[in-house]
């Protein structure tokens, strides 16, 4: 219901949308990078954070406020029914709260290559960006993202 609400509210949105395809793209990209980096973050934690990270956008669109906080609040209420314990819920909700904003993609890749320890929120944030195909977007030239923030090619 919450996801359908976001999709309905974004039906005529010109820029990036936040539907199921986006949420799954973020989860898959995060999971691949975490596997590549050998980070100690479980698949179900990654997917939970990814699937909930934009779920509060409907509330944000309708009443204002920060979608990160709204998404974390929704996750906090629903995750216990999904079998997550308090520690996991805190980890997931903290990552959701910190996922907004954009990173310089090149700088992030340098951190990965230098084996710097990254948190779930770091992976969620960069995956949120990398899930966007800016290189194939018809409105990329009017997007508010800087060129360093845009996903300008297919990452391999």
Feature names for model-found ranges:
Residues 1-156:
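Metal-dependent phosphohydrolase cores
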């Amino acid at each position: 219901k919450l996801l359908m609400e976001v999709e309905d509210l974004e039906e005529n949105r010109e820029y990036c949308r936040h539907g199921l395809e986006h949420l799954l793209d973020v989860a898959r990209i995060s999971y691949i990078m975490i596997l590549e980096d050998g980070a100690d973050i479980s698949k179900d934690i990654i997917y939970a954070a990814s699937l909930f990270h934009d779920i509060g956008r409907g509330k944000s669109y309708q009443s204002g406020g920060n979608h990160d906080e709204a998404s974390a609040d929704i996750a906090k209420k629903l995750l216990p029914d999904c079998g997550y314990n308090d520690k996991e819920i805190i980890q997931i909700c903290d990552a959701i709260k910190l996922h907004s904003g954009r990173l310089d993609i090149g700088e992030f890749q340098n951190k990965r290559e230098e084996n710097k320890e990254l948190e779930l929120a770091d992976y969620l944030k960069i995956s949120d960006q990398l899930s966007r195909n800016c290189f194939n977007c018809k409105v990329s030239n009017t997007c508010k993202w800087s060129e360093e923030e845009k996903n300008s090619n297919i990452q391999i």
